A protein has these predicted regions:
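Active-site rim/loop-helix segments in enzyme catalytic domains that contact anionic ligands
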Residues: 4-148, 175-179, 277-280, 285-289
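A structural signal for short, well-ordered beta-strand segments and their strand-loop junctions
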Residues: 54-56, 102-105, 151-154, 162, ...
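Short catalytic/ligand-binding loop motif for oxyanion handling, primarily in non-cytosolic enzymes
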Residues: 62-64, 109-118, 160-163, 170, ...
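Flexible glycine/proline-enriched surface loops and loop-helix/loop-strand junctions
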Residues: 124, 153-157, 224-229
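Hydrophobic, aromatic-enriched interface-forming segments
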Residues: 150-180, 185-195
Length: 303
């Protein structure tokens, strides 16, 4: 059976076998955010024929460099990390099968990574946090009108964990969706259910390890009550593509770090399941046993 003919099924709940004509837009803050949050979803829908477009708002110049050979590229040294992460993003998108990926504002504008709140990088006038909001919104609205997505995926109001660029990406994405001529039928925010995170923490603890040094999911700002989850994408058939994309982001995701430790100890399925909350549009069948959508395009009419 070819990739285009594959389907995900839970009992009698089935997704379509082809998504040709369907269009998804994802808006993220830095290279690697898309893979960690949505890699399996992106790979699955792309393999099944959907057009998947990624807009990344910054090049992640202020990120920590986890590879010694590239340490000199850090913002505090040669300041070449952004250029390198462009290459990593291209490699990750190749792994996921995504051909349409762009940076917000390119080629005329470049928004710099803002760093964390109350840091020196956060005070720079060229960073995304201090952006001309109307300009950035207009740039993204133009992409929306070009792509005409049926679904938009981005962060919640706190950007998952409070990073300024994640918060700003959320604000720009939601404002652009409001201001664009094309009205997106369904908008989703990334969400990580508390129960899933706690299961991972407990399983790691049983193996004598930990995840990010915590023993309670409530200590992680991105852990949300399970009631917030309205959609669950089973992308386990595409998790190998997601792992390859994670490896492509080598300066940011260490192979001996917590993300790979989860899959090494608990199995790849820990990264194959991705969760969302629907904030615009109608929740539509098919549903899983918990009443969550199993297809982000459900209920969408092609146009």
């Amino acid at each position: 059976m070819g990739e285009a003919d594959r389907y995900i099924a839970t009992g009698v709940l089935k997704m379509k076998t082809s998504y040709v004509g369907y269009r998804a837009l994802l808006v993220h803050a830095h290279p690697d955010d898309e893979t960690i949050n949505n890699g399996a979803t992106m790979a699955m829908y792309a393999a099944l024929g959907a057009k998947v477009t990624l807009v990344t708002c910054t090049r992640g110049e202020e990120g920590e460099v986890l590879v010694e050979d590239h340490a000199h590229k850090a913002a505090t040294l040669d300041d070449l990390l952004g250029e390198h992460r462009e290459i990593e993003l291209a490699d990750a998108m190749a792994a996921l099968g995504i051909s349409d990926f762009r940076f917000l504002g390119a080629p005329d504008f470049k928004y710099r990574d803002s760093g964390m709140m109350e840091t020196e990088p956060n005070r720079r006038t060229d960073n995304f946090w201090n952006v001309d909001f109307e300009r950035a919104t207009s740039q993204l609205a133009a992409i929306i009108d070009e792509v005409k997505p049926h679904i938009l995926i981005t962060y919640d109001e706190i950007g998952g964990y409070g990073h300024p660029d994640h918060i700003q990406a959320h604000r720009v994405a939601m404002a652009a969706a409001d201001n664009s001529s094309w009205k997106i039928p369904k908008i989703y925010w990334n969400v990580m259910p508390r129960s899933v995170i706690q299961e991972g923490i407990d399983a790691m603890a049983a193996l004598g390890s930990d995840f990010m040094g915590v023993d309670n999911a409530d200590d992680l700002p991105f852990a949300k009550d399970d009631s917030f989850v309205t959609a669950h994408i089973d992308g386990n058939d595409y998790v190998e593509a997601k792992m390859a994309a994670m490896r492509a982001h080598a300066t940011q995701i260490a192979v001996d770090g917590p993300f790979f430790a989860l899959s090494n100890n608990l199995g790849l399925q820990v990264w194959g399941n991705e969760y969302y909350t629907l904030v615009k549009g109608d929740k539509s069948a098919p549903f899983d046993e918990a009443g969550r959508e199993v297809d982000l395009f459900s209920g969408v009419e092609l146009s």
